[in-house]
Amino acid sequence: MSIITLITDFGNKDHFVAKIKGDIYSNYDKAKVVDISNEVSPFNVMEAAYILENAYKSFPENSVHIIDVDSEKTIEKKHIVMCLDNHFFISADNGILSILSQNINPEKIFEITIQEELDR
């Protein structure tokens, strides 16, 4: 069973976290989605990085960690996938994953380009 974790600055009052989970389950109903935190202070990448760094190692290898903090996709702000310590991290390219990988070299880093393909 795949484990997917979420760290967001969305809070829990609105539909945003439920929409992410619904999208995940609609595409992969066997996934197990775990909220690490949805209460990160808005746009606070340092807080998100701190939470992530202290939580991800508690999950099994090959877990997928989605960090949706300060993540509006624009031409200037790309999204990336990083393989680190046998875990997968998905985030905006806003410094969160750079903070996480200060002491461990990532195995791979990819830019997510799926939106460019969908826009064609």
Where are these regions (language model features)?
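Glycine-rich phosphate/diphosphate-binding loop of Rossmann-like nucleotide-binding domains
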Residues: 17
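Active-site histidine-anchored catalytic micro-motif
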Residues: 27, 39, 43-48, 54, ...
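A short beta-strand-loop structural module common to alpha/beta enzyme folds
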Residues: 32-40
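Short helix-loop-beta junction
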Residues: 23-31
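Extreme N-terminal starter segment of soluble prokaryotic enzymes
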Residues: 1-5
